[in-house]
Amino acid sequence: FLSLIPTAINAVSALAKHF
């Protein structure tokens, strides 16, 4: 599960760049 956290953060960061 912990290995998914960086992926989730990366996805949120990518979305934040669009907004």
Swiss-Prot record:
Question: What is the role of this chain?
Answer: Has antiparasitic activity against trypomastigote form of T.cruzi (IC(50)=0.46 uM) in vitro but not against L.infantum. Probably acts by permeabilizing cell membranes. In vitro, shows no cytotoxicity against macrophages. Has antibacterial activity.
Where in or outside the cell is it found?
Secreted
- Alphabetical keyword list: Amidation, Amphibian defense peptide, Antibiotic, Antimicrobial, Secreted
What family, per the record?
A: Belongs to the frog skin active peptide (FSAP) family. Phylloseptin subfamily.
**Cellular component GO terms held in the UniProt record:** extracellular region
Q: In which tissues is it expressed?
A: Expressed by the skin glands.
Phenylalanine amide modified-residue sites: 19
The biological process GO terms on file are:
defense response to bacterium
Q: What is the protein name for this chain?
A: Phylloseptin-N3
